[in-house]
UniProtKB/Swiss-Prot annotation:
<dbReference type="InterPro" id="IPR035439">
    <property type="entry name" value="UPF0145_dom_sf"/>
</dbReference>
<comment type="similarity">
    <text>Belongs to the UPF0145 family.</text>
</comment>
<protein>
    <recommendedName>
        <fullName>UPF0145 protein pXO2-45/BXB0052/GBAA_pXO2_0052</fullName>
    </recommendedName>
</protein>
<dbReference type="Pfam" id="PF01906">
    <property type="entry name" value="YbjQ_1"/>
</dbReference>
<dbReference type="InterPro" id="IPR002765">
    <property type="entry name" value="UPF0145_YbjQ-like"/>
</dbReference>
<keyword id="KW-0614">Plasmid</keyword>
Length: 103
């Protein structure tokens, strides 16, 4: 499956726009607290543990979105958008969305 942030796929023709697809992942308060507690492990100005948890949440959300697209019988998702939000006390949400298309 082709997944892209652009509205079109170079060299491909979009035959049909099917639906909006999305995926979400929420990191619980304890995970966020533990990650912040390990910020002392910052190397080169980056919080490795925190980045790892963000990547994990983003991957989960992307996989969920791709699975929904497969269920709709499409072979590509265009216009991908990734959003991060802090919800409630210490909970982080990663949400991805895009347009499921047939090429």
């Amino acid at each position: 499956m082709i997944v892209t942030t652009t509205a079109e796929i170079q060299g491909k023709e979009i035959i049909e726009y099917i639906d909006i697809v999305n995926g979400e992942a929420i990191m619980g308060a304890n995970i966020v607290r533990d990650v912040f507690a390990s910020v002392r492990d910052v190397v080169g100005g980056r919080a490795g543990a925190y980045e790892s948890k963000l990547k994990e949440a983003r991957d989960i959300a992307m996989d969920e979105m791709k699975e929904l697209a497969k269920q709709k019988g499409v072979n590509a998702i265009v216009g991908i958008d990734v959003d991060y939000a802090i919800i409630r006390a210490g909970m982080l949400m990663v949400a991805v969305s895009g347009t499921a298309v047939r090429i």
